[in-house]
Regions:
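Bacterial Sec-dependent N-terminal signal peptides
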Residues: 1-24
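Generic structural motif
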Residues: 4, 13-15, 59-61, 75-79, ...
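An ectodomain-focused feature that recognizes extracytoplasmic/extracellular
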Residues: 21-81
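Solvent-exposed loop and beta-edge segments used for protein-protein assembly and interaction
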Residues: 64-68, 84, 112, 129
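Short coil-to-beta strand junction motifs in C2/discoidin
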Residues: 82-88
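Short, surface-exposed beta-strand/strand-loop-strand elements in extracellular ectodomains
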Residues: 91-93
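Internal interaction segment
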Residues: 96-167
Length: 167
C-alpha cells in the first residue's frame, strides 16, 4: 500500500511539473503608451505537439481608446521546405471547425523557415472558449497537420487566459 501511495505521488508530481503554464513578462515602451505581455520562454517554449512550439503576446495601446492586439507565434522545429509557390497558409482549427489563418510569404530563396505569427481577435473569445484541435500548414503541395491533444489545448487556453488577464 505504501509503495502504491509513493508511486501515485511521483506520477502526480511529474504531471504537475510537465504542465507548461508559463510566467508572463511585462514590458512598457519608453513613451509609456504601449505595454506588451508575453509568455516567458527563456527556459523553453510551450508546445502544442511534437515539433510545434508557440508563444503568445498581447500589445496594449493606451490612449483615447484602449486597444489590445493578440499574436500567437508558431515555431515548427525542422520544418524547412522548398515550395513551388511564394506563399503558404498556416491555420489554427478549433473544436467547432472555425479556422484562424495567416498567409505567410516565403523568403526570397524559396524556403520557409518554420515560424509564423497568427493574429487573434481582441478579445480572443474564440480561443478562450473552444478547444484548439489542429494546426495545418498548407505548402501548396500538401497539408502538414499537427494534431493538438486535449491536455495541450487546455495548457494553451490557460496561457492565453493569463496573457488576457495580465496587468
Amino acid at each position: 500500500m505504501r509503495k502504491l501511495a509513493l508511486s501515485i505521488a511521483f506520477v502526480l508530481t511529474g504531471l504537475v511539473m510537465n504542465a507548461q503554464v508559463a510566467k508572463i513578462i511585462t514590458k512598457v515602451n519608453e513613451a509609456g503608451d504601449v505595454g506588451s505581455f508575453e509568455l516567458d520562454c527563456n527556459k523553453g517554449f510551450p508546445t502544442l505537439g511534437k515539433g510545434l512550439k508557440y508563444n503568445i503576446t498581447r500589445h496594449e495601446f493606451k490612449g483615447v481608446e484602449l486597444k489590445n492586439t493578440y499574436h500567437v507565434m508558431l515555431v515548427m522545429d525542422r520544418f524547412f521546405t522548398k515550395v513551388l509557390n511564394n506563399t503558404m497558409t498556416i491555420s489554427a482549427v478549433f473544436s467547432d471547425g472555425t479556422k484562424v489563418s495567416k498567409i505567410e510569404t516565403i523568403e526570397d530563396d524559396g524556403y520557409f523557415d518554420g515560424a509564423c505569427t497568427l493574429t487573434l481577435a481582441s478579445p480572443p473569445e474564440l480561443a478562450l472558449n473552444l478547444d484548439l484541435k489542429q494546426i495545418i500548414v498548407n505548402t501548396g503541395e500538401k497539408d502538414v497537420v499537427y494534431t493538438v491533444s486535449a491536455q495541450k489545448s487546455n495548457e494553451f487556453k490557460k496561457n492565453l487566459k493569463n496573457i488576457v488577464d495580465a496587468k
